[in-house]
Amino acid sequence: MKQRTIKRPVEAIGIGLHKGVPVKLRLEPMAEDSGIVFYRSDKGVSIPLSPDYVVDTKMATVIGNEGVMVSTIEHLMSAIYAFGIDNLRIIVDNDEVPIMDGSAISFVMMIEEAGIKELEAPKKFIKITKEVEIKDGDKFAKLKPNEKISFDFEINFDHPVIGNQKYMFNFSTKNYIEEIARARTFGFLKEVQYLRSIGLALGGSLENAIVLDDKKILNDSLRFEDEFVRHKILDAIGDMSLLGGNFIGSYEAFASGHHLNHLLTKELVAQEAFEIVTFEKEGEKAVAKAFS
């Protein structure tokens, strides 16, 4: 299997979730072994995709370099991971990736419009070689060895619409588009009101998030009955992309979020619990077929 980029540049305009201002997003092809790099065109600063450049994980995954940041990268990175893209320049003219409809489907459509280009160099996978786990009370996130890529997530909210939800996702690009990409981010009305009081979530609305009061959702409907846990998987895929490539293994979590996911990527690297592998022949392994 070869490294991938996109065939041609593609652009979109949306608003940032927290500042509520317009953001122009542009994806550009890059050569093999370039990796994925964010570029703030308004500041002239590049930020490589790496756990070492994560600067905040409270409300979203935020990366930064030289005091310049790009926030809410996880939905875009989730879609990029799903297509197995290794080399890409991501240009934004503000400090947030646009939220679009709160899911990853707009980014999936951008990538499909741009097309996938295979390069000459072999694709490098991050193969998990031993179990790594991060805990915080009853919350946890772990990566385990497996010959395939899978995500197993459970959440438990004291809310009549959410409650306990579990989802086991066997990864492939096709499955991602059908099962995960359309799942939207969600938040509680009382939290949104507080965030706005401190100047955050100014771009949030029923157009780009599921909003819940104490008893129900305020949106017209859900896209999936278990849309909440599916979105947590969408986020986890985006957060795991900060490893710098597609991993081979199983991700399992209970009530994890951006912070635990980030600590998990850092711990995996610290323990050297992985090896870099390449598959020279297409279809040689089940994991290569997942990206076909």
From Swiss-Prot:
One GO cellular component, as annotated: membrane
Residues the entry annotates as binding Zn(2+): 75, 231, 235
The keyword Metal-binding is annotated on this UniProt entry: yes
GO molecular function, a single term: UDP-3-O-acyl-N-acetylglucosamine deacetylase activity
GO biological process: lipid A biosynthetic process
Pathway involvement of the protein, from the record: Glycolipid biosynthesis; lipid IV(A) biosynthesis; lipid IV(A) from (3R)-3-hydroxytetradecanoyl-[acyl-carrier-protein] and UDP-N-acetyl-alpha-D-glucosamine: step 2/6
Catalytic activity, EC: 3.5.1.108
Keywords linked to the UniProt accession: Hydrolase, Lipid A biosynthesis, Lipid biosynthesis, Lipid metabolism, Metal-binding, Zinc
Enzyme active site: 258 (proton donor)
Cofactor requirement: Zn(2+)
Pfam families for this protein: LpxC
Catalytic reaction equation(s): a UDP-3-O-[(3R)-3-hydroxyacyl]-N-acetyl-alpha-D-glucosamine + H2O = a UDP-3-O-[(3R)-3-hydroxyacyl]-alpha-D-glucosamine + acetate
Class of enzymatic activity (EC top level): hydrolase
Family note: Belongs to the LpxC family.
Function text: Catalyzes the hydrolysis of UDP-3-O-myristoyl-N-acetylglucosamine to form UDP-3-O-myristoylglucosamine and acetate, the committed step in lipid A biosynthesis.
Protein name, per record: UDP-3-O-acyl-N-acetylglucosamine deacetylase
Organism this protein belongs to: Nautilia profundicola (strain ATCC BAA-1463 / DSM 18972 / AmH)
Lineage: Bacteria, Pseudomonadati, Campylobacterota, Epsilonproteobacteria, Nautiliales
Gene from which the chain derives: lpxC
